[in-house]
Regions:
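A short, conserved structural fragment
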Residues: 47-57
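Short, hydrophobic-biased segments on the C-terminal half of alpha helices
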Residues: 43-44
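Short helix-capping/hinge SLiMs at alpha-helix to coil transitions
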Residues: 17-20
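Alpha-helical residues within the helix-turn-helix
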Residues: 27-30, 47-48
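Short, cationic-aromatic polyanion-contact patches
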Residues: 2-10, 24, 56-78
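Pre-recognition alpha-helix immediately N-terminal to the DNA-recognition helix
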Residues: 11-15
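Key DNA-contact positions within bacterial/archaeal DNA-binding proteins
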Residues: 37
């Protein structure tokens, strides 16, 4: 049987950042169960699509969520990131 999930790693990373905006990429990856390298790639994807903004906080990065960005075709044009985060309890 093929392994699948309801929420992609992109959604899980977005949720992890929402709950822990000052965490390192390594810590975020550990929360989700993926490598630090994969986490960096997903963070870049989320930043490129406008879901998050990354800023420096000392030697670390801090992340801000842009909850009004549409989720795209999967959830319909009107669904926003804030609805997904709300469903996940964040």
């Amino acid at each position: 049987m093929r392994k699948w999930s309801f929420v992609t790693n992109h959604g899980l990373i977005l949720a992890a950042i929402a709950g822990n905006p000052d965490s390192t990429a390594r810590a975020i990856g550990d929360m989700v169960g993926i490598t630090e390298r994969a986490t960096h790639k997903i963070i870049t994807d989320l930043e490129d699509e406008g879901y998050i903004t990354k800023s420096k906080s000392g030697r670390r990065n801090a992340y801000s969520i842009h909850a009004d960005v549409p989720l795209g075709e999967t959830f319909g044009e009107k669904a926003r990131a804030k609805e997904l985060l709300s469903m996940l309890g964040l």
